[in-house]
Amino acid sequence: RKIPDSMDFKAAAGFAMVYTTSYYALKQRAQLQPGETLLVLGASGGVGLAAVELGKLMGARVIAAASSDEKLDFVKHLNPDEVINYSVDELKEKVKMLTAGRGADVIYDPVGGDLFDQCCRCINWNGRLLVIGFTSGRIPEYKANLALLKGSSMVGVFLGRFRKEEPLEYENNFQQLLNMYDEGKLNPIVTKSFPMEDFVAAFNVFTERKVMGKVTLEIKAE
């Protein structure tokens, strides 16, 4: 796909995967509606930032959650309605407090592990729990009795399969995202760029879980 004239290479590197993943998750999988409460875990990462940004554009009340105040400060330029530091606050109780006990309507979870377990207990009636990934390292188990009691759904988000099975819908999503970018509604953020020869340092930023926004590798022209 040709990069639009309005988009530079760094923005393009931080655009396609994160925005198409988050848009597919919120639009097709969760069918997010205006006025619903969207909880985004890992909100300072690439897909998390995109989910916060798109959630606001879709008219949701967005709660951005991350593991440090530094990461939450980074997210605040997107104007989430509420923020949660889940290294300090218990996620389940904080979400319930912010939603008058109801819980979130849609939960965007790229983290998994213990946070997923808490999400199952702070989701609203008819809620949708989006499984994006497992950056915590632990693939959690879903308690079927909680789905029954809350009328909730666990919904998988696999962009590669979506692109293969529904290519026209994928392309339609991509074009809508490009239109949003051209209209100044989306702002892909690349916070660190490394020359290709420093790829180990770039990889360490990920393994140490210090990433905010996107990290790119630059290939010099011969």
Across the structure, where does each feature detected by a protein language model lie?
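Short SAM/SAH-binding signature in class I
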Residues: R102-Y108, G127-R128
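Mid-domain Rossmann-like dinucleotide-binding core that forms the NAD(H)/NADP(H) cofactor-binding site
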Residues: A13-D89
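C-terminal capping/lid region of NAD(P)-dependent oxidoreductase domains
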Residues: L178, E183-K192, V200-E222
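Short helix-loop-beta connector
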Residues: D5-D8, Q31-T37, G101-R102
